[in-house]
Amino acid sequence: MSCYEINGEMLLIDCGVLFPEDDHPGVDLLLPGLDYLDDEKLAKVKALVLTHGHEDHIGAVPYLLKRRPDIPIYGSKLTLALVEAKLREHRIRGYKLNVVHEGDVAEVGEQFDLEFIAVNHSIPDALAVCVRTDAGTLINTGDFKMDQLPLDGRITDLRAFARLGEEGVDLFMVDSTNAEVPGFVKSETEIEPAIERVFEKANKKLIVACFASHVHRVQQVLNMAVRHNRKVCYVGRSMVRNMAVAQELGYLHVPDNTVIELRELDHYRDNEVVIVSTGSQGEPLSALARIANREHRDIEVGEGDTVLLASSLIPGNENAVYRVINGLTKLGATVVHKGNALVHVSGHAAAGELLYAYNIVRPRAVMPIHGEVRHLVANADLAKATGVDEKNVVLVEDGGVIDLVDGVPRVVGKIDASYILVDGSGVGELTEDTLTDRRILGEEGFLSVVTAVDTRSAIVVSRPAIQARGFAEDDSVFAEITDQIVTELENAMKGGMDDAHRLQQVVRRTIGRWVARSLRRRPMIVPVVVKI
């Protein structure tokens, strides 16, 4: 999410989520740092612009609108349809959705004039946005690439970018995801032969896993299914929802009697159906992960079946994806993925496309966006290679504050942009301390020590009972430390210590040192001292 503020008015562009990695145990979603938008700032927001319908750009919209549901939202027809489905799931009412098309202009408040530009991406109806203000003109590309043969025929509008460049662009905010990749991204049309070969070789069950928003990929699978006389069955709540929306709006063309419901699956032989599933990133609760773990109640995979992972591997998801691949392989399935076949192309511009964009726009200044630090740096180098002055290439991480004055951007500060963690029904209640506790529990184990003392007599009346979880060693290994705990407690009480909390710290310190020295572990320790 990016935030633009001028003369007491604010504009937001995109409002997405991230999915947790292994260092966020138990976390469901990571929201952008919405804490910056306190009630006073939230009242200044004149609009939220959504560039496209991927989760990392729209996923946090319901959480924002729970605080202020009447924020006007601008986006393409498909993007807003996907957002509306989310808002209904969250039971949010009173929202204001404004459908825009490429070439449209909109005045937002008194400070922002918007123009929308068609861009090509891995989801239909993506838009870039030009924002004109008294401080200067900027373009935010959103996610884009320059596929010259897109499946839907909708190319990135290079003439619009060139025209805006002629008018003068002060700040060009450009997708950096593939800035390290040389050349141009392959066209979506080039993967069709590989998908065809998968269908030709699959003589039993066939499962295709892809992003639930990848309408183009699902369209290719539908076309291939018709050609090979297979029905199509969507599996996964988000897949079913998104494809229904795409079909209703005309973005997905489904021949009659092609799609069947999950409950109808048993009525067909394995070689008469292709299952289109969520879970291409190994998400633990996704349909594909449950199939790989033999936990799906309706679908099983066995010897001779085929699974096609028609997606890229998002950094950070490697372990989860390979666990699913290994699980499917162990069950006897043949797994086809990007590592062994051309079954996916990226939706983000590679270095050659970025250079082309810089040369036709010729911006005064550039701010790389989207991606890790190395991607931002690579994109910055591309901008400088096309002649953008080095001092006008702005590199910032999340929370960076930029001032655009008379068309010149400068980094002037940083705000706290810490992620808000969603844990079940709790939003923002999970703290870093709790996450640390979870990591310790998962990596180092847990020890509880319960004992009773008589502080007046300075004696331990009940020997410490130690319970361990997450240790390879048997509980009997802790027998040698109990005598030391008793000694340390009685010495502390003889010295006048009679507070239960302080005595618990004695226990924690004593067993903690012993475990670190003897077992090379630093577990979570919960001591309980009962005074009698």
Language-model segments: which ranges?
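Conserved hydrophobic residues forming the short capping helix/wall of the S-adenosyl-L-methionine
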Residues: 87, 383, 515
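Short glycine-rich phosphate-binding loop at a beta-alpha junction
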Residues: 72, 367, 526-527
